[in-house]
């Protein structure tokens, strides 16, 4: 660690969490991006990972540029170590959130959560072309987050006996832009919207009641994005059937994909992970996750 620097770890996230399109997000442990910030001239990106080092094209760099400009800072160097797989687990959000928190702490800005979220979401423009809060909010705050506006969000606790199994197929890339364009090609019907609204309401109620099973089951009730985006996931139907057949309570696409995730009881999680890996002949990155408490200073 560089002297007089600040190091922050930010976790992977599952956006949408099934039917909660652009509204729900969940932070999970196991995968993290690490950003180290220290004062420098201008804004510099240092990394050994295959990501852009031009600050305008890097999510963490975008955050730094905006914060340096707004607070008249001398400049900052960001060393980025990527640990979140790309493809539906909030990789760009993790770097953006870690950068915002690291710069805030390094320069003792004392920003509120809402301000950190604003800067982190601005960083998402580099990856997605527009701010997306359903990844950055849970990444910063931890837990399960319901998002509406920049200053209007709720964090809820997820029952501790649930596990989240993520599987990211290798060699498959889906951009957020592609995934959103696909949604416009098939507008949801009224029945689809009603289905998702009821599932979303039941998920929130289940969390308040600490009803883990209902929460997990409703994850698999997306009728807006899944029918369109499943084509981006290799062997999606087989993955879904295998997950449920091995004990999963819920199954859905994580964010824009191609990552998928299953919600399971703790004792079933490893069996589900192994079975899903087998469907893809091991050509994937998989993990079993607990819920994360969000970004933290290392």
Swiss-Prot record:
Compartment annotation: Cytoplasm
Any one Gene Ontology BP term: threonine biosynthetic process
Name of one Pfam family that matches: GHMP_kinases_C
Catalytic activity: L-homoserine + ATP = O-phospho-L-homoserine + ADP + H(+)
GO MF annotation list: ATP binding; homoserine kinase activity
Residues the entry annotates as binding ATP: 85-95
Highest taxon of the lineage: Archaea
Keyword ATP-binding: yes
InterPro entries cross-referenced by the UniProt entry: GHMP_kinase_C_dom (IPR013750), GHMP_kinase_C_sf (IPR036554), GHMP_kinase_N_dom (IPR006204), GHMP_knse_ATP-bd_CS (IPR006203), Homoserine_kinase (IPR000870), Ribosomal_Su5_D2-typ_SF (IPR020568), Ribsml_uS5_D2-typ_fold_subgr (IPR014721)
UniProt function note: Catalyzes the ATP-dependent phosphorylation of L-homoserine to L-homoserine phosphate.
Family: Belongs to the GHMP kinase family. Homoserine kinase subfamily.
PANTHER family (alphabetical): HOMOSERINE KINASE, HOMOSERINE/4-DIPHOSPHOCYTIDYL-2-C-METHYL-D-ERYTHRITOL KINASE
Protein name: Homoserine kinase
Organism listed in the record: Methanopyrus kandleri (strain AV19 / DSM 6324 / JCM 9639 / NBRC 100938)
Source organism phylogeny: Archaea, Methanobacteriati, Methanobacteriota, Methanomada group, Methanopyri
């Amino acid at each position: 660690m560089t002297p007089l620097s600040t190091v922050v770890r930010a976790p992977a996230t599952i956006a949408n969490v099934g039917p909660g399109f652009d509204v729900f997000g969940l932070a999970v442990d196991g995968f993290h991006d690490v950003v180290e910030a220290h004062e420098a001239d201008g804004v510099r990106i240092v990394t050994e990972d295959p990501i852009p080092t031009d600050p305008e094209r890097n999510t963490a760099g975008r955050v730094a540029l905006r914060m340096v400009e707004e607070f008249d800072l001398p400049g900052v160097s960001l060393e980025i170590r990527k640990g979140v797989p790309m493809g539906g687990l909030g990789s760009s959000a993790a770097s953006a959130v870690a950068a915002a928190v690291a710069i805030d702490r390094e320069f003792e800005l004392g920003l509120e959560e809402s301000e950190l979220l604003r800067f982190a979401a601005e960083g998402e423009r580099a990856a997605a072309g527009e701010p997306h809060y359903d990844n950055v909010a849970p990444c910063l705050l931890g837990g399960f987050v319901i998002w509406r506006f920049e200053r209007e969000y709720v964090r809820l606790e997820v029952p501790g006996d649930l596990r989240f199994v993520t599987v990211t197929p290798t060699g498959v890339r889906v951009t957020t832009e592609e995934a959103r364009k696909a949604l416009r090609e098939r507008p949801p019907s009224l029945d689809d919207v009603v289905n998702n609204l009821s599932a979303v309401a039941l998920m929130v109620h289940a969390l308040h009641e600490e009803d883990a099973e209902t929460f997990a089951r409703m994850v698999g009730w997306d009728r807006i994005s899944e029918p369109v985006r499943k084509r981006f996931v290799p062997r999606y139907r087989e993955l879904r059937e295998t997950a449920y057949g091995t004990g999963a309570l819920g199954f859905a696409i994580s964010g824009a994909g191609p990552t998928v995730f299953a919600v399971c009881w703790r004792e079933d999680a490893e069996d589900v992970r192994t079975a899903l890996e087998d469907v893809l002949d091991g050509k994937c990155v998989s993990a079993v996750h607990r819920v994360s408490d969000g970004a933290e200073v290392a």
